[in-house]
Amino acid sequence: MIAREGSNSRKVFIKTYGCQMNVYDSVRMSDALAKDGYVQTEDMGEADLVLLNTCHIREKAAEKVYSALGRLRDMKKSREEQGREFMIGVAGCVAQAEGEEILRRAPAVDVVIGPQTYHRLPDALKRVRRGERVIETEYAVEDKFEHLPVAEKATLRSRGVTAFLTVQEGCDKFCTFCVVPYTRGSEVSRPVRQIVDEAMKLVDAGVREITLLGQNVNAWQGEGPKGEKWGLAELLYRLAEIPGLARLRYTTSHPRDMDDRLIGAHRDLRILMPYLHLPVQSGSDRILKAMNRRHTGEEYIQLIEKIRSARPDIAMSGDFIVGFPGETDRDFEDTMAMVETVKYAQAFSFKYSTRPGTPGADLTDQVAEDVKAERLERLQALLLRQQKEFAESLVGKTMDVLLEKPGRMPEQLIGRSPWLQSVNLDAKTLKIGDIVNVRITATGPNSLFAEVAGS
């Protein structure tokens, strides 16, 4: 048995790639390992266990993981020469998608564990210490959330005043470009009781804002106290009743699951922030059909208008893919026209990346890389202009800002606007966790500047 130095506590370093759900999963893995004697560290050099929580959405993300594993191999060799324990684990969607291939390409890896089996991680590490190389990537019959512990109050409090809370996993939409149904599985909703209990623990520990997470979060379904069917709207109304919870958000949504009840929740609940991430991917009906999005561009625009009618102060965010197989200049111009029509406060855009195992990978009319790059540059310039215009429209206006963390300057705090922007504020008498009414005085490249209203 390889020895450990120092204290009785083992140390784990977790590197998180990709989406907010991976951030949430990393936190829950850390909590599970804490029950097994692990303390999380931000210094990889002092870790006994390194976990890479991976993303498989784009090809470059997966290759980053293999590059990191190459560096970890050398670290492991050095540790073993010193007689010290050092284990390497790959978690997340690359683990789910590639499984045995990871062990083949990176022999230094000890454990490969998919997103549905994180609750088995402590047991997997025990098996590694017995000499096994472990793969846990099957979809578990048991509910992982029932088995993943929530951290103690003191630990939760140390994590800040905002928190993610996963309520739904997986996706049944099978968009032709996307690996999520293959790496996260079909749509599964957490029970109301689990969600409310976790939310109450977070609020009790000082959390003021909770963001509900799901690959397709507005497909969440549950059962109310009288056995009635609940959707995300009913869950939001229930969470809004928790004393001390000041703000709610949710992401990511699919246009087809944006029903009237959910739109009504945006109208009724001031606790629900006026910001909605609603990906569309393309403005071309032909490409939307090829992507299996199951809605048209016009239907998406009409949905946006309906949402804005219910909540006039709402700001929209979205996702776009350029260069999907078969995308013509006309198709791309349809996307540009949609962006001009919707006017996004923020949006994310990417070149299409072929993902093995998806229907899009089998299409032959791939778009040339230089064409993708040119289109992406044009789209991002338009989106950046809209983002700046939205930020500038807030100058001189007042809003409530949740103070989250210290700023770079003395006596400066950084808060979050209702529309998810960072807000820099001189706050001598204020503290983290306060919600303060401010007046926006200026914009920066990626943030706003403000003063306390009335000062």
From Swiss-Prot:
Question: Could you tell me what reaction this enzyme catalyses?
Answer: N(6)-dimethylallyladenosine(37) in tRNA + (sulfur carrier)-SH + AH2 + 2 S-adenosyl-L-methionine = 2-methylsulfanyl-N(6)-dimethylallyladenosine(37) in tRNA + (sulfur carrier)-H + 5'-deoxyadenosine + L-methionine + A + S-adenosyl-L-homocysteine + 2 H(+)
EC number(s) per entry:
2.8.4.3
Residues binding [4Fe-4S] cluster 2, per UniProt: C171, C175, C178
Domain named TRAM is located at 392-454
GO cellular component, alphabetical, reads: cytosol
One molecular function GO term is: metal ion binding
Q: Which family does it belong to?
A: Belongs to the methylthiotransferase family. MiaB subfamily.
Functional description taken from the UniProt entry? Catalyzes the methylthiolation of N6-(dimethylallyl)adenosine (i(6)A), leading to the formation of 2-methylthio-N6-(dimethylallyl)adenosine (ms(2)i(6)A) at position 37 in tRNAs that read codons beginning with uridine.
Q: What is this protein called?
A: tRNA-2-methylthio-N(6)-dimethylallyladenosine synthase
